[in-house]
UniProtKB/Swiss-Prot annotation:
Residues annotated as transmembrane: 32-52, 65-85, 108-128, 131-151, 158-178, 186-206, 251-271, 287-307
GO cellular-component term (any): plasma membrane
Organism: Bacillus cereus (strain G9842)
Extra remark: Carbon 2 of the heme B porphyrin ring is defined according to the Fischer nomenclature.
Cell membrane is among the record's keywords: yes
The organism's place on the tree of life at top rank: Bacteria
Record's protein name: Protoheme IX farnesyltransferase
Protein family per UniProt: Belongs to the UbiA prenyltransferase family. Protoheme IX farnesyltransferase subfamily.
MF term (GO), any: protoheme IX farnesyltransferase activity
Length: 307
């Protein structure tokens, strides 16, 4: 890993620090975009657990509050810790060089302390639901901070797969807050969807940002093995999503049709990449599709329960 970044760090901190408010800096520190997107999956897990256990959301508003706040704090905490860990390589990447731990808006010690405090506070909130929700939160946090950020991210191309484990945990946190047995198969389908989805999503991003990852010394798959192998891996993982809706028949035929159409659309776009000459443009299209895919899919899971 290239650690000779002090000059670049100093230069970015002195000459190119963007004008931001304290609130904007705090949002960047906790990666609010990631927190918000994962909150949807937490809520979906919570909602579906209510639905399949015949429970009312109005009777569980307290648990909903503790679940959303607790999981949000856990995710914000691990994102803070990730910013702290990556402060030496973030200046080398265009999309991360303005993070407050790079620009000096927040000192490393603050990021570390603040991250640990809100992480622990998140566990306290989750404990007000069920111990299993805390365990799921801990597994997600440990995987992201230790197994991904500290271990595999800078050493192995499998970093994307390892990181996807932590990103697949949020719906299980939501489900466990209502049903700590996690015995319903749909709970684990949510986990599998999130796990598999993240791999083509982040590999597409890695293709788009391949030069930045190369400069930072991060062994993402397209950096180490090139675009052709990366495109094959993207296709393999995308195809793996195809059968999952059929294990979620409890959500009805409408959801199964929506999910299958989304999967087919992603697969078709994926195959198109083998005929397209502009790999970067294709990777952007795949990345954007993946974002819309996840939002539509998880919102659909909630909507179909009303009919």
């Amino acid at each position: 890993m290239n650690h000779a970044t002090s000059e670049l760090h100093d230069e970015s901190a002195v000459t190119s620090v963007p004008e931001t408010t304290r609130i904007q800096d705090l949002k960047a520190l906790v990666k609010m975009g990631i927190v918000n997107s994962n909150t949807l999956t937490v809520f979906t897990g919570f909602w579906l657990a209510l639905h399949f256990n015949g429970l009312s959301v109005m009777d569980n508003l307290d648990k909903l509050f503790f679940t959303i706040v607790g999981s949000g704090l856990v995710m914000a905490g691990v994102c803070c810790l990730n910013n702290y860990i990556d402060r030496d390589i973030d200046p080398l990447m265009e999309r991360t060089k303005t993070r407050p731990t790079v620009t000096g808006k927040y000192k490393p010690g603050f990021a570390l302390t603040f991250g640990l405090v809100i992480l622990l506070l998140g566990f306290v909130f989750l404990l007000l639901t069920t111990p299993m929700a805390v365990l799921m939160g801990f597994i997600g946090a440990f995987t992201y901070v230790v197994l991904y950020s500290l271990w595999t991210k800078r050493k192995y191309t499998l970093n994307t797969v390892v990181g996807s484990i932590s990103g697949a945990v949020p719906p299980l946190i939501g489900w466990a807050a209502i049903d700590p047995s996690l015995g319903h198969p749909i709970a684990w389908m949510l986990f599998l969807i999130m796990f598999i989805w993240q791999i083509p999503h982040f590999l597409a991003l890695a293709m788009k940002r391949v030069d930045e990852y190369r400069n930072a010394g991060i062994p993402m798959l397209p950096v180490v093995h090139g675009f052709e192998i990366t495109k094959r891996q993207i296709m393999i993982w995308t195809v793996c999503l195809l059968p999952l809706p059929f294990y979620m028949s409890g959500l009805g035929i409408t959801f199964m049709v929506i999910a299958t159409l989304l999967n087919i659309g992603w697969i078709v776009l994926g195959f198109y990449g083998f005929r397209k000459k502009d790999d970067i443009k294709w990777s952007v299209q795949m990345f954007v599709y993946s974002l819309n895919y996840l939002t539509i899919l998880f919102v659909s899971m909630i909507v179909v329960t009303f009919f």
